[in-house]
UniProtKB/Swiss-Prot annotation:
Domain of life (superkingdom): Bacteria
Keyword Transport: no
Molecular function in Gene Ontology: aminomethyltransferase activity; transaminase activity
Protein name, UniProt field: Aminomethyltransferase
Pfam families on file: GCV_T (PF01571), GCV_T_C (PF08669)
Keywords: Aminotransferase, Transferase
GO BP terms, alphabetized: glycine decarboxylation via glycine cleavage system
Reaction it catalyzes: N(6)-[(R)-S(8)-aminomethyldihydrolipoyl]-L-lysyl-[protein] + (6S)-5,6,7,8-tetrahydrofolate = N(6)-[(R)-dihydrolipoyl]-L-lysyl-[protein] + (6R)-5,10-methylene-5,6,7,8-tetrahydrofolate + NH4(+)
GO CC aspect terms: cytosol; glycine cleavage complex
Record-stated family: Belongs to the GcvT family.
Lineage, uppermost ranks: Bacteria, Bacillati, Bacillota, Bacilli, Bacillales
Provenance organism: Staphylococcus haemolyticus (strain JCSC1435)
Length: 363
């Protein structure tokens, strides 16, 4: 299975620890080390860590770098500083989401885009396509980086004792460069994909194993993609390729905060997003809780109580924290009403569900 798949610097660690390895976005990645529920609960209640070195990194440098980054991205990049990162979207001309990503301003005219692993090549091709109009140099630097995510309510106290900076006041998307961790130079970002406090750590690829092992020695639970998915779904955080796609806009996909179409600067997809901001989008993303027994999977139709199709499930799972069957779905905007009962078509059965908040973390 793994011969043709890409591997992170930690691949041998997965094998040695007996992790269950699966294909994900062209990579051989651990879906679980022990059990998804154990790993999920470690992050929800204590602290766990993920290898996210498969994520892509795209560097944009040059005299027009700040202009180019704004032209590519839907958020207002004027808010970026060399200590404040930003969640944003790479949109096409129709406002559809090519990828959702995080932007770091490393320095003047020096930016780093952190993109989803499965989309790295596609994103880089898109960036290259639009670069010639600007005085910029773009590079896919993914192989230079390792990335770990240390997440959970106890993550801050743990990391605080291991780095040479004060992390106590760091807020979401605050970051610091040139931080020393286990003797290695890292970028430390207060961010994650779990609904919990925590940090994402960017290091040189060659340092990834030493940093991972350092956390293992501090009894941090290694976690796989299975728990990463249940944690993000409980928190109502979208996954590109399911909840966000090239035919779903930020307003439809529930990430309107990452679109700023009223700014002066132009960006790709701006006119469509401006229209949706002013007039509303035809669809919206909602949280669902299934009232009947079953799991709502990606692509299952969502119906009104008369059996008319009004949307589809984009992600679904059984929430380890609450035991409830939860989902995210995209439905016609005028069908939305919090608490409304709907049906989900699960094979030949129609299961009752109700619209709830997307963030369904219950402790």
């Amino acid at each position: 299975m793994t011969s043709e798949l890409k591997k992170t610097p930690l691949y041998q660690n997965y094998v040695d620890s007996g992790a269950k390895i699966v294909e994900f976005g062209g990579w051989a990645m651990p879906v679980q080390f022990t059990s998804i529920k154990e790993e999920h609960n470690a992050v929800r209640y204590e602290v766990g860590m993920f290898d996210v070195s498969h994520m892509g990194e795209i560097s944009i440098k040059g005299n027009d770098a700040s202009k180019f980054v704004q032209y590519l991205l839907s958020n207002d990049t004027n808010n970026l500083t060399d200590t404040k990162a930003q969640y944003t979207a790479l949109c096409n001309e129709e406002g559809g989401i090519i990828d959702d990503l995080v932007t770091y301003k490393i320095g003047d005219n020096d930016y780093l885009l952190i993109v989803n692993a499965a989309n790295t090549d596609k994103d880089f091709a898109w960036v290259q396509k639009h670069a010639p109009k600007f005085d910029v140099e773009v590079s896919n630097v993914s192989n230079q980086f390792g990335q770990l995510a240390v997440q959970g309510p106890k993550a801050r106290d743990l990391v605080s004792g291991l780095v040479d900076i004060d992390v106590s006041e760091m807020k979401p998307f605050d970051f610091q460069q040139n931080v020393t961790l286990f003797g290695k130079n890292v970028i430390l970002s207060q961010s994650g994909y779990t609904g919990e406090d925590g940090f994402e750590i960017y290091c040189e690829a060659k340092d990834t194993v030493d940093i991972w092992n350092g956390f293992i020695e501090h009894n941090v639970v290694p976690c796989g993609l299975g728990a990463r998915d249940t944690l993000r779904l409980e928190a109502g955080l979208p996954l590109h390729g399911q909840d966000l796609t090239e035919s779903i806009t930020p307003y439809e996909g529930g990430i309107a905060f990452a679109a700023k179409p009223l700014i002066e600067e132009d960006f790709i997809g701006k006119s469509v997003l401006k229209d949706q901001k002013e007039n509303g989008s035809e669809r919206r993303t909602v949280g669902l809780e299934l009232l009947d027994k079953g799991i709502a999977r990606t692509g299952y139709p969502v119906l009104d109580l008369d059996g008319n199709e009004i949307g589809e499930v984009t992600s679904g799972t059984q929430a380890p924290s609450s035991g409830k069957s939860i989902a995210m779905a995209i439905i016609k905007r005028d069908e939305f009403e919090m608490g409304r009962e709907l049906l989900v078509q699960v094979r030949k059965r129609q299961l009752k569900a109700k619209i709830v908040k997307k963030n369904q973390i219950e402790k």
